[in-house]
Amino acid sequence: MSRSAGSPGRPWLTVTAVGALAALVVLVVATVSPAAVRGTAPSAISKTAAHKCLVMTGSGDPAFVRNFNPYTATGLPSGQFIKGALYEGLIVTPAGGLKPVPWLARTWKWTNGNKTLTLNLAKNVKWSDGTPLTSVDVVYSLKGGNGAQAKTMDLLGYTRPDTNIASITAAGKYAVVIKLKTIDSQFISTTLNLAFIVPQHIWAKVKNPATFTNPHPVASGPFTTIARFTTQDYVFSKNAHYWQAGKPLIGCLEYVQASSNDSALALIQSGQVDWTHNFVANVDKAYTSKDPAHFHAFYATTAYPQSLVFDTTQYPYNLVPFRKALSQAIDRQSISKLGEYGYAPATSALGIEFLFPQWVTDASVKAQAKALATYNPTAAKKTLTDAGFTYKGSQLLDPKGNPVKLDIHVISGWSDWVASDQIIAKNLQAIGIDSKEVLEPDWNSWYPNASSTKNPTLLWQVGGQGSPFGFFNANLSNNAYVAPGLDATNTGNWEHYKSDQGTALLQQWKQTLDPSKQQAAATALEKLWLQQLPIVPLFVGPRWSTYSTRYFHCFDSPKNHFGDPIFTTFPDNSLSFTQICPGGKAGQ
């Protein structure tokens, strides 16, 4: 999962149709975990305001397990900030199209007709054990380790038969050269941004990176020492060898559990937690008004839309009219207003106009996208009956004569999604689908559904990038395709859809630097999207960042916006972890 494509810490939904093949729908929201209280910083860490731990709580964590493997701990939101706090990338490409920020790679240059990328590395980086970070580590990481390790560690697709990467080599101790087979104008923002660098001298000895828990991590990030670990909270203290002079500006990070949106709210209201990415209903009344000078909320719309996603390889989700009818049957405005308290605007069936209006220029695309997203149960029923669906009384039957059923599963503490899935269930009942809400106790009871072949649908939100390319690439490209039953975190292809036409259009987009030709490819992809509707966008994906400046300033905010504002989004969180400063300095 990754702004990276598919980074959890975002809502999910799984849907199931009952017939020859039953379907399940799992809807997830922005928080979960057993209740916890704030722990105290280790005695070795000063408890002054300048050095107290920045305390965070997030969404979806059961009892913590000591797993700091950045390749496998990504299923839990707490595991997401392992990348950013411990492990770092080469170039930070912030969400929302902001300017790329040099990181471990301080400069880069394209040559050979834009097919060769040379990365010049920082020369003063050390791993937390004091060993220098060099091109050997970068080449090892980008290639996906050695041999069999690539099954777990190949984030760039270097070992895939269809890879566009011709070679990755070191050019001395502090430069790396990546040669591509064809031009890829999106390589840095959609491929290289997935990469984080691990120490070759540690990981080359790991026999099975899929099961390795990395209990004592060696990393290059700003917070690498596990100062305390319990099943309810843990503390990362700063890296004594960190390469950015004077950073991090704070002494430690602490992550604690919260069982629900309400319990997380209680923790931040009391001052026990400084930062959370949990939904807060009526946030002005419930939180910011309690201490206007210090309590803040920044709900940035820097992510792709929340969408209803189906396993398009399974019946009846392989039927385009069925997918379109579901889009027509869902009342997006009510979900936005009642389920999300107006913080998440409803989208069209295209889903990208809010984030990328400059890329949606065709009038026919706009009209069709609006029509498919207009709440109209009567039109939805006609779409279904025209496609061979029938009714037995008020019950919808698929073309094979089987009843259609969608059970919506949601973690009980995620109050916004409990409300939203109730609206969805009611909408589906109105067109004859047997739909009900099923409450799940925690993340561990829900998460296995995402990759199960028995549960072919989910609600998914991937991180925003500088253009719609990443959105279309995840959902239309043969190169991003992930077979049913496998984890699609790295590519975001949870609906298991692929398109030869979409792949060709994406290639056209990648292989040109001409903005007009890129726009032409984008418009063609938009038209293809509305023809096929592989997933159903519902509303803009908000990034719930609720934070207190009683002890810390310099958070990502409307006045200080530099990327995705939540702490689970890599690589943007690298910016937050190195910029957040003690109270008394400028900024919110």
State where each predicted segment sits.
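Ligand-site clamp/hinge motif
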Residues: 211-214, 240-286, 422-425, 434-443
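Surface-exposed binding/hinge segments that line
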Residues: 49, 120, 155-204
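Detector for C-terminal structural segments
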Residues: 229, 238, 327-365, 378-379, ...
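Extracellular/periplasmic solute-recognition and catalytic clefts
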Residues: 145-155, 167-169, 226-237, 254-314, ...
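A structural "hinge/loop" feature
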Residues: 58-81, 103-106, 131, 186-197, ...
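N-terminal lobe/hinge region of extracytoplasmic solute-binding protein
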Residues: 55-112, 143, 216-219
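Gly/Pro-rich hinge or "lid" segments in bacterial periplasmic/extracellular proteins
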Residues: 76, 94-96, 192-248, 252, ...
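Alpha-helical secondary-structure segments
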Residues: 55, 134-141, 173-179, 183, ...
